[in-house]
Amino acid sequence: MTQIAVLGAGSWGTALTVLLSTKGYPVKLWVRSQATLDAIQAAGQNERYLPGVMLPPAVKITSNLEEALSGAELVVVVTPSHGVREIIKRAAPYLDEDKYIVSASKGIEVDSLLRMTEVITAELPFQTERLAVLSGPNHAEEVGRGMPTTTVIAAGKKAVADHLQDIFMTPTFRVYTNPDVVGVEMGGALKNIIALGTGIADGLNFGDNSKAALMTRGLAEITRIGTVMGARPLTFAGLSGLGDLVVTCTSMHSRNRRAGIELGRGKKMAEVTAGTGMVVEGIRTTRAAYALARKYGVEMPITEQIYKILYEEKNPHVAVVDLMLRGKTHETEEIVTGFVDW
């Protein structure tokens, strides 16, 4: 069977390890430190990031990157987005064009404004067609416990997407394929910004109407910037767009929503990040998306106000008023783009 290396032992990396190992694949889980390795081995689970989900005994855990990648035919990258470049740079000597690489990290690199597959490509010393992205409405807490969900594998080559679909598909984890790598990545990254917004609405004690409006107009923003960058508009109506947006904006599993709640209650960004103990991807992604909007001349008013709350300490109440009092406009807009297909 395909030998798999999972790089990153956060909640999502742990959940994917459980999923793939339970299916019978030999999986090596790479962790950053010996202390993390010892803690997981002692407890039989990742108590810090995914408590209550036992790792199958067959999983091999290592803090040695060369050992993790030795013999691997599929490499799953599941580190926080700001750490992807560093880990690929370190892993590059042990990678080759025959290995499949799947990015399961959701975010945009702030300095370069690159998507995760672009970052990976930039650090590989070779060209590869065996690169894909996995994204969808997939909270680790539920996937690790075998609760039914669906996801998307996007790749530039249909054969690559089909092969990976077969590997990841289980009776509780249904995988769809998509040729739109840009759209799938952008949907997975940008929904975290809108989840911060719905959390802020909760923290301000607003109602369901407010959150529905934020999600709907947030999806319009995501679609607007995504299509300018080459994505297919319909992708954002699918699992990696609307599906991921809904679950991230409504679930208390969502770190971004929980962080938004604290912001709405008056805490500053530094207080929120210090108190989570986990990475809140939406905070960095807001900064990147704000820069992308300016770069491409795309209107993203929700993103702009969340940026000002995070980085300029704007009062959330004032931000909401400014959103509501914007100039009048039409709801729908024409989006012209090429059709993405294999």
Feature annotation, model-predicted:
Residues 1-53, 60-63, 90:
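NAD(P)+-binding Rossmann beta1-loop-alpha1 motif at the extreme N-terminus of oxidoreductases
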Residues 15, 35, 63, 79-82, ...:
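Conserved active-site and cofactor/substrate-binding residues in soluble primary-metabolism enzymes
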Residues 51-60, 127-129, 171-173, 298:
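A short helix-to-beta-strand connector/capping loop
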Residues 83, 94, 119, 123-126, ...:
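Internal alpha-helical scaffold of NAD(P)-dependent oxidoreductase catalytic cores
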Residues 198-202, 227-237, 243-342:
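NAD(P)-dependent Rossmann-like dehydrogenase/reductase catalytic/cofactor-binding core
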